[in-house]
A protein has these predicted regions:
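Short aromatic/hydrophobic contact patches that present stacked aromatics
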Residues: 1, 62-66
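Conserved glycine-rich beta-strand-loop-beta hairpin in the small C-terminal domain of fold type I
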Residues: 1-3, 35
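Feature detects long, helix-prone N-terminal segments enriched in hydrophobes
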Residues: 57-58, 69-76, 91
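Conserved PLP cofactor-binding pocket of PLP-dependent enzymes
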Residues: 15-51, 57-63, 91-93
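Hydrophobic "lid"/C-terminal helical patch
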Residues: 83
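Short, conserved charged micro-motifs
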Residues: 7-15, 71-77
Length: 93
């Protein structure tokens, strides 16, 4: 998750995702943080009476990376390097 209070001026989640993608590493926004909003929960009684603020916050700050068993160590290393490089810029004071 991208913590808003730790971002440098001019950086937001979309800019972070774009910068990681520009380095050739697939990166996306989103999560299933507010899954209770899905149609499958209509009429079940399982949906909370009010939106859950932490779930909403996580949904608006999350980033996603490809994770699957066919990734090579080199691909994982490239991903980690790109994340570190971008986050160093995105959190600089």
């Amino acid at each position: 998750y991208v913590r808003p209070e730790q971002r440098a001026a001019g950086w937001n989640r979309d800019r972070i995702v774009a910068a990681i993608n520009a380095l050739g590493v697939p990166c996306y926004q989103g999560s299933c943080s507010e899954v209770y909003m899905e149609k499958a929960f209509d009429g079940t009684g399982w949906r909370p009476a009010a939106p859950l603020p932490t779930a909403h916050a996580l949904g608006t700050t999350s980033v996603m990376f490809l994770v699957h068993p066919t990734l090579t160590q080199a691909e994982v290393d490239t991903t980690c390097t790109a994340i570190a490089q971008v986050m160093q810029q995105a959190t600089a004071a």
